[in-house]
Amino acid sequence: MLYLIYQEDGDNATAIRAAKKEEHLAYLETHKDKLVLGGAALAEDGVARTGSILLLNVPSLADAEAFSQSEPFRMAGLFKLVKITRMRRGQWHPENAPKTAEGA
């Protein structure tokens, strides 16, 4: 089942992100069998980070919550809001995804 995890940054996010970045990336690599897509939520300027968005393929909401609660950024208190919602895959056109992280 697909679950979308939407996370909004809280206070001191820049410092927490810098301190926990390597742990965060290692955690995502360890769980890449569950991770469909992940990336930073950005302000309209395309530079300022406002949070993170993850799309997981896991058996249940409990599994999505466990993944989120064990993620190093969340454990460090980076996010002021975390919302997890189940979704159904509708249209799927991965060929339309940008070729770079910046969206080009």
Task: Locate the predicted segments by residue.
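Conserved, structured core segments of small domains
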Residues: M1-A104
